[in-house]
UniProtKB/Swiss-Prot annotation:
ATP binds at I238, G239, K240, G241, G242, Y243, G244, V245, V246, K261. Signal peptide: none annotated. Its EC number is 2.7.11.1. It comes from Dictyostelium discoideum. The active site is at D350 (proton acceptor). Pfam families: Pkinase. Keywords: ATP-binding, Kinase, Nucleotide-binding, Serine/threonine-protein kinase, Transferase. InterPro entries: Kinase-like_dom_sf, Prot_kinase_dom, Protein_kinase_ATP_BS, Ser/Thr_kinase_AS, Ser_Thr_kinase_AGC. Transmembrane segments: none annotated. Residues 79-115 have a biased composition (Low complexity). It catalyses: L-seryl-[protein] + ATP = O-phospho-L-seryl-[protein] + ADP + H(+); L-threonyl-[protein] + ATP = O-phospho-L-threonyl-[protein] + ADP + H(+). This is Probable serine/threonine-protein kinase DDB_G0293276.
Length: 516
């Protein structure tokens, strides 16, 4: 149920006034037709996004949500970020409020020629436009994993929809005012709920509005003792991408080596921090302190330094895939990592070798939870746009369908293929070409071991409801001989050297640090 929060009462009533109503006529049928026009306006944005996927016919339903856009990082085209503030909106104007079923919303795409990668559509109805809206599920995504009692949001959404339906089924002009009251009450209830479930971290309404002061940011970010960049000695830059930059530092107080990640100061930063706090570090990177940069424009996250580097570095270093047993070990450990975060009702949404980092003991940990989502165990999470790296994105994400932990298992199938062969199964020179390859199932023809191939095929099932899950993955013949209880603590097959496991840059990073 979408909750309209931008002068919702005034705009709703003004919109209602523009629809001819027979106030002095008892003709209920005509009145119901008028009411149905108003209902169409509010229900248009929550219309189902379900799309069918098959090898013969691919249907792509463009969502009217303003969040469905892709931002391609110029320096790293395989890092994509959801762009909620795009200025390239494509406005579709309908001259009649009742004409919300635009036939252009359904496009056949045996190729992706009809897809606008920067699609940021907002359906503007004549005299009924300029609504600022979000759904409870979108709000969950926005505030992310600080929402401890996220199910309350879904209950609130269901209550609003049920009460609205009761009003829709009434007869009489008072329904307009009743409907306005529902939207007003829903906004108030949502605000109270968000403040309650985020009282220990952040008032989400302030975060969404971007109105937090520097002092409020520092209060939200406080994790342990108060720190500043002056407490660390910079060593080198060890990572850079669409998320920001990661540098190696030495903590002057403890003389411990740390990694500090620098990201934009927005609610996605708080989402990632809250996620990492919740996960605790057994299967994910540990965080110790969070604080603002000296210029107050960036968020700095002090994390454990994982000396082994990421799998992407080592794949690039060897130029081909890993030895079979090492690829199997890393795949198995990633399965355990996914088990852990999924039990916490979190979907990573960006599983790839770059985010699989090897710790000092030679075992895999996950990092970069900037795209992570909370999900409801009883129903899939809404799709807020194409998030992740093109080569690892699942079909349901590309088709703007609801998401579940199955999106991580699709990415695991891509990663497994890459760990074995050194390349990904779906390729292209641009993100669009990669997406077309994924949807058309055009894969690289590379011979691999029989059991490995069978598992990859099951992981890359285009239907998320039949895609193989954790239990069946662990029981697959490919993992015969793997002890799932001890693999994360046993002696690894190979342990990287303690140094030279990163593509480092000292001078360039110094300039960046000085700009903080």
């Amino acid at each position: 149920m979408y909750i309209y929060i931008n002068n919702e009462i005034e705009e709703l009533i003004e919109c209602a006034k523009k629809i001819p109503i027979l106030n002095n006529n008892e003709n209920g049928n005509d009145h119901n037709k008028s009411i149905s026009k108003l209902i169409t306006i509010f229900k248009s944005k929550q219309r189902s996004r379900s799309s069918s996927f098959s090898l013969d016919t691919l249907n792509f339903n463009l969502s009217s949500s303003s969040s469905n856009s892709i931002e391609i990082d110029d320096e790293n085209p395989y890092n994509t970020n959801n762009n909620n503030n795009s200025n390239n909106n494509n406005n579709n104007n309908n001259n009649n409020c009742n004409n919300s079923n635009n036939s252009n919303n359904n496009k056949n795409i045996n190729s992706l020629d009809n897809i606008d990668i920067n699609n940021n559509n907002k359906n503007n109805f004549n005299d009924c436009s300029s609504y600022s809206s979000f759904s409870s599920s979108e709000c969950l995504s926005d505030i992310g994993n600080s929402c401890i009692d996220s199910l309350e949001l879904f209950r609130l959404s269901d209550d609003i929809e049920e009460e609205s339906e009761m009003i829709f089924n009434q007869v009489g002009p008072d329904r307009y005012n009743d409907l306005a009251n529902i939207f007003s009450k829903s906004h108030k209830n949502l605000t109270i709920l968000l403040k309650d479930i985020n009282r220990d971290t952040l008032d989400c309404s302030e975060c969404i509005d971007g109105s937090l002061s520097d002092n409020e940011w520092e209060k939200c970010l406080c994790c342990g003792d108060i720190h500043s960049l002056g407490d660390y000695k910079h060593v080198e830059c060890i990572g850079k991408g669409g998320y920001g930059v990661v540098c190696k530092f030495i903590n002057k107080k403890t003389n411990e080596i740390r990694a500090i990640k620098t990201i934009r100061k927005d609610y996605s930063a708080l989402k990632e921090i809250n996620t990492l706090k919740e996960l605790g570090g057994q299967f994910t990177v540990n965080i110790f302190h969070t604080f603002l940069s000296p210029c107050k424009e960036k968020v700095l996250i002090e994390m454990e330094y994982l000396s082994g580097g990421d799998c992407a570095f080592h794949l690039n270093d060897v130029g081909v895939g890993f030895p079979e047993e090492l690829a199997k070990q890393y795949t198995a450990e990633t399965v355990l990592c996914l088990d852990f975060i999924h039990e916490k009702s979190i979907i990573h949404c960006d599983i790839k070798p770059n985010n699989m980092v090897i710790d000092s003991d030679g075992h895999i940990k996950l990092l970069d939870f900037g795209n992570a989502k909370k999900f409801n165990q009883k129903k899939p999470t809404s799709n807020d746009g194409i998030l992740g790296s093109p080569r690892y994105i699942s079909p349901e994400v590309l088709l703007f369908e609801p998401q579940s932990p199955a999106v991580d298992y699709w990415s695991l199938g891509i990663v497994m293929f890459e760990l074995i062969t050194g390349t990904t199964p779906f390729i292209g020179e641009t993100p669009e070409e990669i997406f077309e390859s994924i949807l058309s199932r055009n894969t690289e023809c590379i011979e691999i071991q029989k059991d490995a191939k069978d598992l990859i095929i099951k992981l890359l099932d285009p239907n998320p409801s039949t895609r193989i899950g954790s239990k069946d993955i662990k029981n697959h013949p490919y993992f015969n001989g793997i002890n799932w209880d001890t693999i994360k603590t046993s002696q690894p097959i190979w342990k990287p050297n303690s140094s030279n496991n990163f593509i480092t840059s000292i001078n360039g990073c110094c300039k960046l640090i000085n700009s903080f």
